[in-house]
């Protein structure tokens, strides 16, 4: 899939642990920030629906610290019937520091998995 999106951020104090390194949860917040940015860019914010996380994973390759400037790149890797697998990379100075994936499942108001919409599928497939 050719669709991807990039967001830029700076590691905030709140993103760090007592040792001054990023807390592991920060990577998932930044990935979600990029996910929302991509949805916004593709016109998929209105009527977005509910997408709980089914699986999250991250590999931390380099240390990120307070005030580091980062780039967060996300792309849909796989579109299932009811799910999207996002892959993301977080870089500093063109060096990959974190890479990971999120599997999200579209659910209806009762929390039951629901098919992706045709609009979503077309936009995310590129």
Show the residue positions of the predicted features.
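HotDog/MaoC-like acyl-thioester-processing domains
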Residues: 3-7, 60, 64-66, 77-126
């Amino acid at each position: 899939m050719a669709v991807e999106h990039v967001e830029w951020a700076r590691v905030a104090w709140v993103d760090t642990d007592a040792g001054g390194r990023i807390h592991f949860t920060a990577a998932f917040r930044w990935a979600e920030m990029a996910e929302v940015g991509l949805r916004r860019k593709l016109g998929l914010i209105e009527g977005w629906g509910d997408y709980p996380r089914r699986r999250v994973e991250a590999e931390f390759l380099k240390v990120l610290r307070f005030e580091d400037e980062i780039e967060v790149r996300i792309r849909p890797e796989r579109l299932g019937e009811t799910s999207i697998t996002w892959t993301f990379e977080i870089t500093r100075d063109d060096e990959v520091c974190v890479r990971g994936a999120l599997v999200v499942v579209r659910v209806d108001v009762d929390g039951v998995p629901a098919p992706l919409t045709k609009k979503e599928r077309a936009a995310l497939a590129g």
